[in-house]
């Protein structure tokens, strides 16, 4: 597992799919949708299959071997 990545967001929340793109762990929205719908993305330890899930600073998103800390 690689070191956690801090991902600063400019608003109070960001959609899960947008966060994956912003962090650079997926190439585009289609890939974000695919991995989220496959059930391989977790928010705060729980699998979430909703691309529009709102995440906020303090949330931790995991995908494959990446850990994203929303800041």
Which ranges hold each PLM region?
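A detector for short, charged/polar N-terminal pre-domain segments
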Residues: 2-14
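A positively charged, amphipathic N-terminal helix/segment that binds anionic biomolecules
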Residues: 4-6, 60-71
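A basic, amphipathic helix-loop patch mediating RNA/tRNA/ribosome contacts
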Residues: 14-57
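A short, structure-level motif marking secondary-structure boundaries and short turns
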Residues: 1-2, 43
């Amino acid at each position: 597992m690689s070191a956690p990545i801090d991902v600063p967001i400019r608003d109070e929340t960001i959609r899960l799919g947008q966060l994956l793109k912003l962090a650079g762990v997926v190439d585009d929205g289609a890939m974000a949708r695919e991995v989220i719908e496959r059930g391989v993305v977790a928010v705060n330890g729980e699998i979430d299959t909703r691309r529009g899930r709102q995440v906020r600073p303090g949330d931790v998103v995991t995908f494959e071997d990446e850990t994203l800390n929303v800041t």
